[in-house]
Amino acid sequence: DAAVKIFHGKDSIFHPSVDVVFDAANSRMLLSKSKGKFKDAPYASTYFGVDFSAERLRWDLKTDSIDIYSESAAAQAPVVIESRTHFNLSDFLLLGGAGFSFHPVVLVSTYAIENRTNTFYADDLVKKYKRKPGEIQMALEFLAQKGLIDYDIKTGKVNVKERAIHLTKSFKNK
């Protein structure tokens, strides 16, 4: 598994955990979603301002095009593309996760907004909201799997993505 960021000028496509096959002889790269904890994390495209879920990306490095596709075992599956400014109340409520006594997106976004920083540590959330470290860690891993934050489990460093803040602001304005 590898985190991959494909640059195109100032823009990029990013995924936190994919399997990479590079064919140097033919200048081709195949990215496949790993089966680990980030299997549900979307790819992020800064050029289009979207997140998208797909099983594989295939890139012939001699061209400027990337093939994006999804397949299930039985048939083709859709590639889901979602604007970072999209808000759906039902989807947002599902991001509350199961087993949390708080809404993880609201918790991290509110902390980021109130402290005017998107980067902080898990311990900051534990202290501010008086939550158990294990509960905060589970919530942060959940949000990282959904592509809403970057989370370094070893250091506890959190970077809240603009999408998470947008979701919380949209929810509070509803």
Label the predicted regions.
Residues 1-174:
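Structural signature for solvent-exposed beta-strand/loop edge elements and short helix-capping sites
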